[in-house]
Curated annotation (Swiss-Prot):
GO terms for biological process: L-histidine biosynthetic process. It is an enzyme of class 1 (oxidoreductase). This is Histidinol dehydrogenase. Belongs to the histidinol dehydrogenase family. The lineage of its organism: Bacteria, Pseudomonadati, Pseudomonadota, Gammaproteobacteria, Methylococcales. The gene is hisD. Catalyzes the sequential NAD-dependent oxidations of L-histidinol to L-histidinaldehyde and then to L-histidine.
Amino acid sequence: MTEVKIKRLYTGDADFASQLDRLLAWSESEDTDIHQRVTEIIGCIRRDGDAALVELTARFDHFVVDTAAALELPRDVLEAAWQALPAEQAKALREAAERIRAYAERQKLDSWDYREADGTLLGQKITPLDRVGLYVPGGKAAYPSSVLMNAVPAKVAGVPELIMAVPAPRGELNALVLAAAYISGVDRVFRIGGAQAVAALAYGTETVPRVDKIVGPGNIYVATAKKLVFGQVGIDMVAGPSEILVISDGRTDPDWIAMDLFSQAEHDEDAQAILISPDAAHLEAVQASIERLLPGMERAEVIRTSLERRGGMILVDDLEQAAAVANRIAPEHLELSVESPEVLVESIRNAGAIFMGRYTAEALGDYCAGPNHVLPTSGTARFSSPLGVYDFQKRSSLIYCSPDGADQLGRTASLLAWGEGLGAHARSAEYRIRHH
């Protein structure tokens, strides 16, 4: 087994900042060819609707149907998939869904208002989105957890109609994905994928209804399409490769740390796994664990490439410095594998999800802990948050003026409007002023 060459950094090095920048750098292939093809696909769907959808589904998914209506999956197929699940799988899926739902319930925003002395009422009205599109990657390697994480918060928010798009290569669908759609309350399912599915959801066809927002992960074509339709519809986020950052005080079993790093590195070659510790001997022990455990992994080659290309081990002087480096990285997943995580977490400002303590494996959050696994990547945790109920609700401002309120506010508004040279604004306010 050849050595796994993982980049080593030390905060004491003069060029540490630039070394860290190089380690974190990831430029999504701004492939003009892909951009062009996706633009063409979106144009086809906008122009030809159902006919284009049927043709593109046959071309890209090798799934041939006579009409677009045949792309929709009857609701009883979802129920049958759920009923046919082995009891243990059904129990695990239900438990995960219930935990995600319980967490999401606490995120709900409520409308509020307050009244001023003159009777004027000001407030905020919370309304769920009318219709949301959920994209789910298809084929055999499907992700039922992704269905739960996207669908359950939408339903908790009160979204009346949830439309799922899932590609069916050669007509094949994953039963677990359909079962997850059933128990999380998905309303309609279309067997469509790629940029053509995103375009159909964004603009609508004769058969596929137009949605207000599109959520869910996908390949580079799906991500590019989501970017291009943003503005026509809302999107959740443009996700980069998966990331994990582990801060260890040196007292966690090195095998545990190695496997936690593997858990993200196995996603794909661009995934990033980084370990930070003030204990140099611990970094060596984890390196040894990596080399011992890697040959037994199912996705050993992907993990090796990911660790050698984008992995890192960072030696720091103390845990406070570790927190400062973590804030600079702003990771998607952050594990605090330390004695007192509740103390260290106070220093963390930028992270998608924070896993506190040695026993809290990031994988638990991926599947069933409760918090959402759709998280900001590529440093966007500096200004973004995990997917949640609030992503499926919108806020409207409420203003009600009593006659007295209109009199008072009208005088202020009139002065400001004339100052801006907007006479109609000023007069509109003045008409409601009481002339005593």
